[in-house]
């Protein structure tokens, strides 16, 4: 039953969040935009304490249900693993020892990058951001191509319910990052299920620590267990250890509460609930008390996280204006950020680099940055499009508050940069023709 509930909820969340990245009309944002705002990293960078407390509370009660069906990257791994099992006879899942050194090292690097202001690089490790880049750069072109085919077919029959949409590749670096992320995640999912979640993902590491103390969890009745190994072979988190002559154990820091073990146990030895003394359940790896080293590390992590949150609250408007040159199109020293971002510094501190705003921009004026410090975060590029004064789509969809919601009136009066007149490019001077476009626009 638990597995069926998980699959149903995971399907709803995954489809709705994916449609947020694919949709170019803004329709799905009205109904499902909140699903992006309840993702863990956007909530942390946006200082959304309600969502943070809610996710931690749910983890302390039910375990890592966030990783099970809320996180789109987690569900995407399950889909990839399911397809891989169609082409193999044996289930690849086996118990593996926890790689805690690697997990906490990646988490430490993630926090340090956030503290130092390299949010774009830190987002390369974040699950929601990684899936957003995959959906925006790899899935959305296919979605738009399908729409354009339908639009052409409908137009030939006199139906104009569909309309064609132009798509352009937003940069080679962002495409390479998306492809690499897709390959790494799919390979890890096909080989070991939730390996990414339990070795690389910083969100999984944080929630895994709290899940060790969850009130409800799957537990094994040692008296009923026959050590058949069915649960171990179907645990996609490699968290169940069953061995002859040994007490069966579950590592709750890695368990994602998928319910697979419950469905495959034929002896009724597995139960999802609160393990009490009356249940005579064995001690599990996930319930071992933390040693002094672990406590010291968690203390350091808490301090670093606090520093990151304090840093995220700094809002400085730095102008972001490029030096004006009258010789050629100037090289922008500071990238232009969307109205509502307050400043380049504020955008860099709060943006998760999920590229939802890039995917939703109707005029394709936003593109991912290639600068090291703001890598994959959005910047305004007028070389490909223009920003409509009445459009506030990027602010409406931003899940982390990096682009603040702004009224159309305020947007029209917000200066994001200066126009630069390049004399040698002015056709009235070079060709002697009438123009006046700059005055009209």
What are these regions (language model features)?
Residues 1-254, 259-441:
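Non-ligating segments of multi-cofactor redox enzymes
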């Amino acid at each position: 039953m638990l597995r069926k509930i998980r699959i149903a909820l995971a399907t709803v969340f995954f489809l709705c969040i994916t449609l947020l990245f694919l949709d170019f009309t803004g329709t799905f944002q009205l109904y499902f935009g909140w699903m992006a705002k309840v993702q863990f990293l956007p909530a942390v960078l946006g200082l959304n304490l309600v969502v943070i407390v809610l996710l931690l509370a749910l983890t302390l009660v039910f375990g890592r249900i966030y990783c099970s069906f809320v996180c789109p990257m987690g569900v995407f791994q399950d889909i990839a693993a399911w397809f891989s099992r169609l082409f193999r006879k044996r289930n690849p899942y086996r118990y593996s020892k926890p790689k805690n050194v690697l997990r906490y090292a990646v988490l430490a690097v993630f926090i340090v990058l956030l503290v130092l202001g390299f949010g774009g690089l830190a987002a390369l490790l974040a699950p929601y951001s990684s899936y957003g880049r995959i959906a925006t750069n790899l899935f959305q072109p296919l979605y738009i191509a399908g729409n354009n085919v339908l639009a052409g077919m409908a137009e030939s029959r006199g139906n104009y319910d569909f309309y064609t949409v132009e798509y352009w590749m937003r940069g080679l670096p962002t495409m390479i990052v998306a492809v690499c992320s897709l390959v790494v995640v799919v390979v890890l999912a096909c080989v070991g299920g939730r390996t990414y979640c339990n070795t690389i993902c910083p969100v999984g590491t944080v929630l895994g620590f709290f899940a060790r103390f969850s009130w409800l969890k799957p537990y094994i009745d040692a008296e009923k267990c026959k050590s058949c190994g069915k649960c171990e072979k179907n645990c996609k988190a490699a968290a169940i250890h069953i061995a002859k002559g040994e007490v069966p154990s579950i590592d709750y820091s890695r368990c994602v509460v998928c319910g697979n073990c419950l469905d495959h146990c034929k002896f009724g030895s597995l139960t999802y609930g609160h393990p009490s003394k009356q249940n005579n359940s064995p001690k599990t790896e996930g319930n071992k008390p933390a040693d002094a080293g672990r406590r010291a590390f968690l203390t350091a992590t808490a301090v670093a996280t606090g520093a990151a949150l304090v840093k995220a609250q700094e809002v400085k408007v730095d102008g972001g204006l490029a030096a004006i040159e009258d010789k050629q199109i100037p090289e922008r020293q500071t990238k232009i950020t969307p109205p509502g971002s307050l400043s380049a510094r504020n955008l860099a501190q709060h943006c998760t680099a999920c590229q939802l705003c890039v995917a939703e921009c109707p005029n394709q004026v936003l593109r991912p940055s290639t600068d090291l410090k703001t890598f994959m975060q959005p910047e305004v590029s007028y070389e490909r499009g223009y920003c409509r004064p009445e459009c506030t789509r990027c602010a409406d969809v931003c899940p982390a508050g990096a682009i603040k919601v702004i009224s159309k009136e305020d947007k029209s009066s917000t200066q994001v940069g200066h126009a630069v007149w390049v004399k040698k490019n002015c056709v009235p001077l070079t060709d002697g023709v009438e123009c006046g476009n700059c005055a009209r626009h």
